[in-house]
């Protein structure tokens, strides 16, 4: 399936494809 967002942003970046930083958690783009 698709990767799940939800990791903590690191310096404003998310490493899961298709996710963006909604500080402090990554959200689906």
Swiss-Prot record:
> Which terms does the UniProt entry file under GO BP?
defense response; killing of cells of another organism
Pfam families named among the record's database cross-references? Cyclotide (PF03784)
Which residues pair up as cystines?
5-19, 9-21, 14-26
Q: What is known of its domains?
A: The presence of a 'disulfide through disulfide knot' structurally defines this protein as a knottin.
> Which residues form the Cyclopeptide (Gly-Asp) crosslink?
1-29
Q: Which InterPro entries match?
A: Cyclotide, Cyclotide_sf
Official protein name in the record = Cyclotide mela-6
Concerning its family, UniProt says: Belongs to the cyclotide family. Moebuis subfamily.
Gene source species: Melicytus latifolius (Norfolk Island mahoe)
User: Which key words are in the record?
Assistant: Cytolysis, Disulfide bond, Knottin, Plant defense
Please explain the role this protein plays, according to its UniProt record.
Probably participates in a plant defense mechanism (Potential). Binds to and induces leakage in phospholipd membranes, particularly ones containing 1-palmitoyl-2-oleophosphatidylethanolamine (POPE). In vitro, displays cytotoxicity against cultured cells but no hemolytic activity towards fresh erythrocytes. Not active against Gram-negative bacterium E.coli ATCC 25922 or Gram-positive bacterium S.aureus ATCC 25923 up to a concentration of 64 uM.
Processing after translation: This is a cyclic peptide.
